């Protein structure tokens, strides 16, 4: 069973082909260089660049997987959530291909895809406890099957990735800010500044607006005083506060729900501290199936959509 999957929810246009659970190809057209000067993704530009990249991405996916379009059995695409213009482009491409080869169309959820990106090389044993961390989402999900997802907690304001990017912008690090802060944090003292660990309560919800404001205020105060900004120390202290609450909420969820698989998903799953937290908690609570996605599957890609589609189809047979 061959599935062609399309991911276009933001500034990546990606096509992947999977054959009976094995990824044959995962072509990604990234637009980071085009958006960096704007300090973030420009929706109209993202959609226009998707249009320009469709042809070569499709051609590359078919050629690199040695697949003829007629050999595809199902066509999957990201339906939501995301930038509306970018999503429409992906949907139209998927509908066109499915109509041309007369094969079923599968609209899928972007976040569910991210979670299954972690299962590309590691099979899930249910129930799965998944920590979703990205530019648009920060949430904890219980996954009981490819068709059963329960969000037990989510951010009430800023997502963790959004917070990283905004702090990085004020620090003058540019976009995308997450990897740059993570790298700087390795050189800094996490105890140099005491930033608030927000939403430190019994719920599974998150809040990052207070942390973001606290860091920005420190930077502005130092700037107004004409003092040097210790970027490494600020990065380390910020990262500690941003990730410590993830550790606390996840540990509470592990104790309550007793998952058989522990994983993390989304663009911020590439963060070194987040990855360390996942592996440490898995070891502490003897969760044998504890894993983080390969770096290539952390950010948006169609392989994760292809794997989700495959698992859904397999579960229905």
Curated annotation (Swiss-Prot):
GO terms for molecular function: iron ion binding; N(6)-L-threonylcarbamoyladenine synthase activity. The lineage of its organism: Bacteria, Bacillati, Mycoplasmatota, Mollicutes, Entomoplasmatales. GO terms for biological process: tRNA threonylcarbamoyladenosine modification. It is an enzyme of class 2 (transferase). Fe cation binds at residues 110, 114, 300. Substrate binds at residues 132-136, 165, 178, 182, 271. This is tRNA N6-adenosine threonylcarbamoyltransferase. InterPro entries: ATPase_NBD, Gcp-like_dom, KAE1/TsaD, TsaD. Its EC number is 2.3.1.234. PANTHER family: TRNA N6-ADENOSINE THREONYLCARBAMOYLTRANSFERASE (PTHR11735), TRNA N6-ADENOSINE THREONYLCARBAMOYLTRANSFERASE, MITOCHONDRIAL (PTHR11735:SF6). The gene is tsaD. It comes from Mesoplasma florum (strain ATCC 33453 / NBRC 100688 / NCTC 11704 / L1) (Acholeplasma florum).
